[in-house]
Amino acid sequence: IEIDPGFANAYNSLGYTLLEQTKRIKEAERYINQAYQLDPRHPYILDSKGWLAFKQKKYIKAIEYLNDALKLQKELDIYLHLAEVYWTQGNKRKAADVLKEAEKLWPDAAELSALKKRLKMPNAQN
């Protein structure tokens, strides 16, 4: 960030890491928002915005960002995040649909089974 203050991915990576690894959500939000200002159409930045909104319990906003990210790039982590948002929001059917779509693209991804198991979804592998 010091070397290249215009490098959106650096802000995004730092913000997402803070979001996932610490309780410093406000600081994470600042970095993710800076990344978004620099590159609002980058799928990973949109994913981070969505995941941040999810952590803040802003589920509708989270779904918007994550769907926007998926329109730009089909990426397993984005599908996993979107499914978890839907599940937490209570939309179990939509969560299952998102995971089915991901399973078509990544049939052997262990992360899919792990998420189903963690959320205690039906048909989760034990």
Language model features with spans:
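Residue-level signature for tetratricopeptide repeat
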Residues: 17-18, 52, 85
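Structural signature of tandem alpha-helical TPR/SEL1-like repeats
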Residues: 21-34, 56-68, 90-101
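Amphipathic alpha-helical repeat scaffolds of TPR domains
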Residues: 8-17
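Register position in tetratricopeptide repeats
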Residues: 20-21, 55, 88, 118-122
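Canonical tetratricopeptide repeat
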Residues: 13, 48, 81, 115-118
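TPR alpha-solenoid repeat register
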Residues: 10, 45, 78-79, 112
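Structural marker of alpha-solenoid helical repeat scaffolds
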Residues: 3, 38, 71-72, 105
